[in-house]
Amino acid sequence: MVKKKAKFRHISINKKKFYFYEIKWFDILGDSGHASSKEFDAMKPALMTTTGYVYSKDKKYLWTFASYDDETFSDRNCFPIGCIKEMKKVEI
């Protein structure tokens, strides 16, 4: 039996492929008000989900975008790698 190669959602801009990902990441939670020890202990960062195309990634950062045309990118983000919990390439 021949195993089919997974096909992942992507786009091409100027002959470069950009793959579409679902990214789960921790968002910092802040509060400037007064709180008890119990309330303070209950603080947890929010687990967020972002979908978009990965522009670039290195040891420190992940850059994404969600909108584009033939030459420019919009809806851009830059995530510190330490905040990212999980990245999944989206299949077609």
Each predicted region: which residue ranges?
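Conserved RNA-binding domains used in RNP assembly and mRNA/RNA metabolism
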Residues: 2-92
